[in-house]
Amino acid sequence: MAPPTSKRIKTLSVSRAVIYGNTAKKIGENRPPNAPSEHTHLWTIFVRSPTGDDISYFIKKVVFKLHETYPNPVRTIEAPPFELTETGWGEFDINIKIYFVEESNEKFINFYHRLRLHPYVNVNPPMSTEVKKEETGNATTSDEISSIFYDEIVFNEPYEDFFKILVSKPGNLLPSNKTEDCLFSRQLEQDELTRIKMASSNVDKEIEIYKKKLEDTLKSR
């Protein structure tokens, strides 16, 4: 990391939205070249803008660390799109490191994503995972699994030079409603808050029921 050439802007924070995750499909009759015979799925791991915009103005590179059974398991993507495609048969945790442009003088961020090849078996799957029906291609079947998460990277007190870079773009603002091109929206966020409130309310009701039962039991003794 080079020494900063500008000062930090105190009491200021700038956030940039990203999505990360993977898509996966079963391999069809025509297998991808060099795919091992035991591999059953074709998958892609990625870091993107939720609106499909370019994020390379603040992200320098993304490093994906795959399972050690893969050749060269540490894969570095230094230009958009920040993604890689592989084949495999099992689910595992992928370590993701996001490095920022030199002007940021920020440390990389480090997190994990659980590679998902199969849909959830519960009746009401989380919003992050869905099955998408598509036309059957030569290499894969028609059912695509998506495990995608939304997050915001917050830069606290950014350096002046980096701040200028950040504000040179609109900031990947989420649309009001979900579209085919953008699954995440402000409406989805509000829906999630509503579900959390409903769940919290249900828990409170259950607690009151059990408290009443306990009180009745103690009185009957």
Curated annotation (Swiss-Prot):
GO terms for cellular component: chromosome, telomeric region; cytoplasm; NuA4 histone acetyltransferase complex; Swr1 complex. It comes from the Eukaryota. Belongs to the YAF9 family. Component of the SWR1 chromatin-remodeling complex and of the NuA4 histone acetyltransferase complex. It comes from Candida glabrata (strain ATCC 2001 / BCRC 20586 / JCM 3761 / NBRC 0622 / NRRL Y-65 / CBS 138) (Yeast). The keyword Transport does not apply. The lineage of its organism: Eukaryota, Fungi, Dikarya, Ascomycota, Saccharomycotina. One of its GO terms (biological process) is DNA repair. Keywords: Activator, Chromatin regulator, Cytoplasm, DNA damage, DNA repair, Nucleus, Transcription, Transcription regulation. It is found in: Cytoplasm; Nucleus. Residues 8-169 form the YEATS domain. CDD domains: YEATS_Yaf9_like. Pfam families: YEATS. Component of the SWR1 complex which mediates the ATP-dependent exchange of histone H2A for the H2A variant HZT1 leading to transcriptional regulation of selected genes by chromatin remodeling. Component of the NuA4 histone acetyltransferase complex which is involved in transcriptional activation of selected genes principally by acetylation of nucleosomal histones H4 and H2A. The NuA4 complex is also involved in DNA repair. Yaf9 may also be required for viability in conditions in which the structural integrity of the spindle is compromised. This is Protein AF-9 homolog.
